[in-house]
Amino acid sequence: SETLTVMPRVINTANNYIAIGENIHATRALRRDGKRVETLADGTEGVPFKDIQGESHLLNVPEHFKKTQPYEQGQIKHFMVAIWKGVHGNADDQEQGAKYVVQEAHRQEKAGARFLDLNVDEVSYDLAEQKRAMQWLVKTVQKVATVPLSIDSSNSEIIAEGLAAYDNVAGPPLLNSVALERVDALDLVERYNSHVMLTAASADGMPEDAEERLENVGRLIEETMKRGIEPDRVYIDPLAFPISVSKEYG
């Protein structure tokens, strides 16, 4: 019978821990009145940043973004802005969007990320637009990445688009993620020889307790073994929560 390689019960060195950088998401937001957002004398609003060469820039907020609900509620979804510029902007916008994304990828690598997670789900409600955004993001980040990419989405079609665009130069990608509600996503793991994140979610929602988590993950591990997916390509997200959420997590 096949045995699984597992992480130690006690993580006491950096070598026992695998960090996935999850900042390059269209969901990420900054407060408009926060210290990272700047308004120039001419009224231009944006996020100051330095590219990987150390040159200063301002990721300015396009006018149409100012009509969105997050902006009106005091937030700037800065990676959404960068991705929009990269996909739809003029030449200057495209360069600015790419530099913003690249500097964040570089920053996360320096901090020890072993995978760079990319998610574009909130870019649009339109699937074709989401796929286009994922293609652009993967191709932009992989030009500079020295660690593999993690392709993250709630939609398997978007994940497939990202995996297809990835060149594998930095190593096999990570599919983030597979749960009981979409076991068929493991087909993509086989097709692209990727790593995979298995989550402890139930087929119809969040698990109630540790026993249900173990049961859910066990069923998923069985599916990976049926497909011949090597244990060292499999990672587990137990969906752990702080005790402040519920006493069940204590």
Show where each model-derived region lies:
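Domain-level signal for soluble alpha/beta catalytic cores
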Residues: 1-238, 243-250
